[in-house]
Swiss-Prot record:
Source organism, top-level taxon: Bacteria
Organism encoding this protein: Prochlorococcus marinus (strain SARG / CCMP1375 / SS120)
GO BP of this protein: tRNA 5'-leader removal
Name of the protein: Ribonuclease P protein component
EC number: 3.1.26.5
Amino acid sequence: MVLPKGMRLKGYKSFDYIHKSAKRYKSDSMMLRVTKANERLIKSTIKNSKSNSCRCAISISNKVSKKAVIRNRLRRLLHNHLKKRLFQKDAFSNNWLLLSLSPKCLDKNTENLLEECDKLLIEAGFC
């Protein structure tokens, strides 16, 4: 299940902003970048959505796997997990999150990967 349109983070300007100004939290197989929302970088059609101002993106490079099937499976898994967390609490409001996976994530099973994601969210102060 993908995130609703109002919670998706899109556009190269948004990603550049996150890479330049975000606070980083790193673990063995992923990195979480968190920054305050900058609504000027969002297109006007997306701004009108009924979502809170929290937006998320998951970045998985070809280094993780050459097969798109595997990368998409990981993306869907993490989108679903973040979606549950976002609706569970309003602590994410007014923040942008970028979750980047490293090639070591393939060595872990799904439970360990989700636990690691939770640890990063706790370290960032969201849970």
